[in-house]
Amino acid sequence: MSVCPAPRSPVRWLHAFTLCLLLAVLAGCVSVPKPMAGAGEDVFSRVGRFAITVTESDGKQQAVQGGFAWRDDGGSYLLDLTNPLGSTEARVEGRPGMAVLTRANGERLAAEHPDALAEDALGSPVPVTGLRDWLRGRLMAGAAPDGLERDAQGRPTAFEQDGWNARLSRYDAQGPQLLVLQRQEPGRRILVRLVITQP
């Protein structure tokens, strides 16, 4: 994945979004990150694939895909992002008061909050905090959802939070195995698709 020099270009945005997910985010060669020190019973992990498409107002599209491995103990988390061949592109490590993104080339970005880290990298907001909840099949705390729909078991299946329209489906015991997130911004529409391949 190459980075274009224009800071707001679709390719740069896609590249940075991929590194931050991730938002979020992916294929069969991905391994689950090693257990975190002090991890307790609330450990949550997901492995899967992601696809991100940005459609500009003129109809031009940019797309990127890859794999992710997410491990979260409720206090801290690790997110490894891979390219389609399985090579690690980035690792995001977060805990209260600190989020660090380390790229494969060793470059590091840090912020006090994961959403701030994503915004620094992308130039626009990304709901990293929301993904922590949405991957578990629950609503993000502190942000009232619009258009909330639930399945027969009471699990959220469709809603809008923090500017993102979310559809969650194919639930297993840990949460949804398919997440489709859409966001409309001035001049572009962002579509993020996450498919869980391992619990």
UniProtKB/Swiss-Prot annotation:
<keyword id="KW-0732">Signal</keyword>
<protein>
    <recommendedName>
        <fullName>Outer-membrane lipoprotein LolB</fullName>
    </recommendedName>
</protein>
<feature type="lipid moiety-binding region" description="N-palmitoyl cysteine">
    <location>
        <position position="29"/>
    </location>
</feature>
<dbReference type="GO" id="GO:0009279">
    <property type="term" value="C:cell outer membrane"/>
</dbReference>
<keyword id="KW-0449">Lipoprotein</keyword>
<feature type="lipid moiety-binding region" description="S-diacylglycerol cysteine">
    <location>
        <position position="29"/>
    </location>
</feature>
<dbReference type="InterPro" id="IPR029046">
    <property type="entry name" value="LolA/LolB/LppX"/>
</dbReference>
<keyword id="KW-0998">Cell outer membrane</keyword>
<keyword id="KW-0472">Membrane</keyword>
<dbReference type="GO" id="GO:0044874">
    <property type="term" value="P:lipoprotein localization to outer membrane"/>
</dbReference>
<comment type="similarity">
    <text>Belongs to the LolB family.</text>
</comment>
<comment type="subunit">
    <text>Monomer.</text>
</comment>
<dbReference type="Pfam" id="PF03550">
    <property type="entry name" value="LolB"/>
</dbReference>
<keyword id="KW-0813">Transport</keyword>
<comment type="function">
    <text>Plays a critical role in the incorporation of lipoproteins in the outer membrane after they are released by the LolA protein.</text>
</comment>
<keyword id="KW-0564">Palmitate</keyword>
<feature type="signal peptide">
    <location>
        <begin position="1"/>
        <end position="28"/>
    </location>
</feature>
<keyword id="KW-0143">Chaperone</keyword>
<dbReference type="InterPro" id="IPR004565">
    <property type="entry name" value="OM_lipoprot_LolB"/>
</dbReference>
<keyword id="KW-0653">Protein transport</keyword>
<dbReference type="GO" id="GO:0015031">
    <property type="term" value="P:protein transport"/>
</dbReference>
